[in-house]
Amino acid sequence: MELNEVYQYTKEHMEKTIDAMKRDFATLRTGKVSTAIVEPIRVDYYGTPTPLSQVGSVIASDATTLVISPWEKNLLKGIEKAIQEANIGVNPNNDGDVIKLFFPPMTSEQRKEIAKDAKALGEKAKVAVRNIRKESNDKIKKLEKDKLITEDQSKKAHDEVQKYTDDYVKKIDDMVKSKEEEILKV
C-alpha cells in the first residue's frame, strides 16, 4: 500500500459517509412532505420484500400529501399493510385505485424533535469520519514501521489526513445547520 492509496481510501470513505448522511436526512420530515420518507418501506411482492418505488409510483401531490399508484391493483392491500407496519406516523387512505398519505402539519415541538434527530445523524457521521481518520493514520504508521515511508513523509501524511477530516467535519456541520434551518422553517 502507498500513501496515494491511503489518501484515496480516506476520501472515498469520508465521501460515502456524507452520502449515507444525505440518505438519512432525506427520511427526516421537513415542512413539506418528501417521497424519501417512504423509500425504506418494503412491500411483499410475490414473496419478495421489494422497495415501494419498484411496485408503483410515489409522488408528492402537495406539501402534505403523498400519492402511491401501484402498477398492479392487487398490491394495494400489501402496500397499505407495509405502510402501517413502517410506523411513519400516518395511516394510509386506500381508495381502490391509489393510496394517499396525509401528513398533518408539524407542530413546533415536532420540528424541534426532528431537528435534534438531524443533529444526532450529523454526530454519527462525524464519528464515522473520525474512525476513518484513525484507520488511515494506522495505515500510515504501518507504512512507516515497515520502512516504506520516512518519518517526514509520515508526518505530512498524518497532516493531510487531518486536513481531509477537518474538511469533511465542516461539510457535515454545514449540512446539519442547513437541514435544521429547513426543518425549523414554518
UniProtKB/Swiss-Prot annotation:
A Pfam family reported for this protein in Swiss-Prot or TrEMBL: RRF
Gene Ontology molecular-function annotations: ribosomal large subunit binding
Compartment annotation: Cytoplasm
GO cellular component: cytosol
The entry's keywords: Cytoplasm, Protein biosynthesis
Annotated SUPFAM superfamilies: Ribosome recycling factor, RRF
Domain of life per record: Bacteria
Keyword flag Protein biosynthesis: yes
Signal peptide (residue range): none
Single GO BP term: cytoplasmic translational termination
HAMAP family, per database record: RRF
Similarity field: Belongs to the RRF family.
Protein's job: Responsible for the release of ribosomes from messenger RNA at the termination of protein biosynthesis. May increase the efficiency of translation by recycling ribosomes from one round of translation to another.
PANTHER family, per the entry: MITOCHONDRIAL RIBOSOME RECYCLING FACTOR PSEUDO 1, RIBOSOME RECYCLING FACTOR
Protein's name in the database: Ribosome-recycling factor
Native organism taxonomy: Bacteria, Pseudomonadati, Campylobacterota, Epsilonproteobacteria, Campylobacterales
